[in-house]
Regions:
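Active-site-flanking segments in enzyme catalytic domains
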Residues: 1-176
Length: 176
């Protein structure tokens, strides 16, 4: 019997709206779910000991990753309320963008992010450049898709108007 976090990850995939499933089926090469952290999964051993882009830890401590059109989700504990939804958020951000731009690079999301920026609690989401915006996109998607909307309000320092605008964006675009 697989551990509960693996079962939850698979259940999350099954529960996604059809529009998201179609985008992922068209845009991704693979989704890997298994035991351990990222370096233990899908021939990702080369990431063992390598620092994360944030520089705060290494990939060994990480329960999920997205890159090269692959979602990888393991059983390691994670601060993310839902690792699978977070990685799906990154994947959608990538595959739903246009050309070399991710969806979070679009003018529409960029404007939404700028509106939310003064309310963001986490320095991780306020990082300059692409990283903060992409992580906010993935975390916001994860909070909404996993039915943990209060987590989105908390990310935005209790600003419900900004949280509602973010929820509306994801509802219109992805049906969540």
């Amino acid at each position: 019997m697989p551990p509960p976090q693996i079962v939850r990850a698979i259940d999350r995939l099954a529960d996604l709206p059809q529009i998201i499933k179609a985008k992922l089926a068209t845009g991704l090469d693979a989704i890997y779910v298994g035991m351990g952290g990222v370096p233990s999964l899908d021939d990702m051993g080369q990431l063992s000991g390598v620092p994360l882009p944030s520089g705060r830890a290494t990939w060994d401590a990480c329960a999920g990753a997205y890159g090269e059109r692959k979602i990888i989700v393991g059983s390691r504990p994670s601060p993310s309320p839902d690792v699978m939804c977070h990685e799906i958020g990154h994947a959608l951000d990538d595959v739903d963008g246009s050309g070399d731009q991710w969806q979070s690079d679009s003018e529409e999301f960029h404007n939404l992010y700028e509106q939310c920026l003064p309310h963001m609690v986490s320095a991780f989401h306020r990082q300059p450049g692409l990283l903060g915006r992409r992580e906010f996109f993935a975390d916001a998607f994860a909070a909404i898709a996993s039915r943990q909307r209060p987590a989105l309000v908390e990310m935005l320092g209790g600003d419900t108007r900004s949280a509602l605008n973010v929820m509306l964006y994801f509802n219109v675009r992805y049906g969540i």
